[in-house]
């Protein structure tokens, strides 16, 4: 819950989540589409990956042998509300991303 609230409080993190919500997208495209500095984008994407709000959907290799990751948001929508002494966060998960995460977890066993 705290990671979600922290992400919502940061304009660049919200841009990254929005950009990767409906499709897997390379980091370089996020940098261009969201107009975020390169270093900042990588730092924030790594933070989102560490917190489980973003996942690496796939890794592609270019014809010249370079690897790059496509990332995707785990969240599809959020609803945050406050009720007497309680902060409630309801999340709708991006099913494609959640399935990928489950597949990866189960393949580790």
Annotate each PLM feature:
Residues 47-48, 59-66, 85-96:
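Short, surface-exposed, charge-dense and proline/glycine-enriched linear segments
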Residues 76-109:
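Amphipathic alpha-helical dimerization/coiled-coil segments
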Residues 3-11, 26, 57-82:
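Short, cationic-aromatic polyanion-contact patches
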Residues 30, 41-51:
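Basic amphipathic alpha-helical segments that dock to polyanions
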Residues 3-4, 8-36:
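N-terminal helix-turn-helix DNA-binding core of bacterial DNA-binding proteins
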Residues 23, 47-51, 76-78, 96:
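Short, charged/polar surface micro-motifs in flexible loops or helix N-caps
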